[in-house]
Amino acid sequence: MPDIKQRIKEREKMSSSKYVDRVLKDTIAKNADQKEFIQAVEEVLTSLTPVLKANPQYEENAILERMVQPERTIIFRVPWVDDKGIIRVNRGYRVQMNSAIGPYKGGLRFDPSVNLSVLKFLAFEQVFKNSLTTLPMGGGKGGSDFNPKQSPHTPGKRCSDAEVMRFCQSFMTGLYQYIGQDTDIPAGDMNVGGREIGYLFGQYKRLANEWTGVLTGKGLSYGGSLIRPEATGYGDVYFAENMLATRGETLEGKRCVVSGSGNVASYAAEKLMQLGAKVLTLSDRSGTLVFQDGLTAEQLAAVMELKNVKRGEFAELKMAGAKFVAKKNPWQTVSKYDCAFPCSRQNELDGKDAAYMLKNGVKLVGEGANMPCTPEAANAFIQAKLLYSPGKASNAGGVATSGLEMSQNSERISWTREQVDARLKDIMKAIHDNAYEAAAKYGKKGNYVVGANIAGFVKVADAMVAQGVC
């Protein structure tokens, strides 16, 4: 992390707003050890200068100062017993960032990388993402440093289902009093899928003695929504479709590189294939799978079985028509491609990757993960005038469909797959159009980063002004 004074000078060069400079300086000073959170705040605030100058009431009401501070941060211990009878203790978190436009909404992440900085960055991004969906949802994020992929007592083995269940039950015991269908509605995220959501929901129901839509991403047998697992990946591709349409192009025949192999990456790949694109890669922590002739439906099914059933890594997989490249990300593994969809994790794509991609003719980058591009990479794409969408806009399909699940739970109804998919398409088009129009309105036409930040910010800021100092 660079020296604080150096970072402040860098920010002052980028921003022409004294208000933004002041808030950034204070935020950096108070959160000097939280690099992910500072990166997210810098990216948003430095793009808001035009709207702040046009609306002095935001500074008068200290909107930025309040927006960068969580309304509430909950940290709790999570004790559980492993299969050997040994007591283990992890740390649990929930960052309730902003509830100006609705109850807190955002996922839970179980991974050793989880800390307060990561969750504050994700919660901050979630505020704007949820605002962009046009649904009444505030922003939050939570999780734990628990690693379900590594047994605490057997190296190279995963936690058993029983261990994951006991951990989830303990985690919910620490969290349940702070959440509720009108207060805070968590969902899944990294390493929190249908199995974990089921265990968490069961424990909440037991503790609260009520069945409510307190979690989204539930199974279809107990209140879940069709399309929810697919929604983030599908939405990312729908957003890319809308970006290409502004230049009279489609995804038909485009060569696409996708990173990741979880739900976001897998379903982005599926939708790309359905729309006539050729998917060249998927990846995980062990390396990248390259599909020289394009990913097939059969190969994707094998990947999803490996990840969702066997819970293995690509290094273990033998597949005809696929080449495994160990310890490499996809960006420089393939030489010629048109579109990139980073769907793995934050800061996975750096400045060197971006330079390689630009040199080799990439036309579009659609973020499926949260903040997967470093500032250097993002700036390179913006300067080159690529079709580049920030995750808060292009991966909002997941939380949008969570909002649709909340609606179905409230009404005690279930929509068809076609109904949910149609609503998802409409929401992604609305997000695209709002970001595109906001950028054009403030003199940044085609800059989806600025457009998404402004469009997401204004709705929340106006609500905060209307509600007074709270």
Labelled PLM ranges:
Residues 287-388, 393:
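Rossmann-like adenosine-cofactor binding region
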Residues 216-219, 224-336:
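Glycine-rich phosphate/diphosphate-binding loop of Rossmann-like nucleotide-binding domains
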Residues 7, 11-40, 243, 358-470:
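Adenosine-phosphate binding glycine-rich loop
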Residues 183-185, 221-228, 386-390, 444-446:
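A short glycine/serine-rich beta->alpha loop
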Residues 2-226, 459-469:
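N-terminal ligand-binding/catalytic initiation module
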Residues 121, 183-187, 211-215, 281-284, ...:
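General beta-strand structural signal in soluble alpha/beta enzymes
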Residues 27-31, 45-52, 56, 123-131, ...:
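Structural signal for hydrophobic packing residues in well-ordered secondary-structure cores
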Residues 18, 32-39, 43, 58, ...:
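Conserved active-site and cofactor/substrate-binding residues in soluble primary-metabolism enzymes
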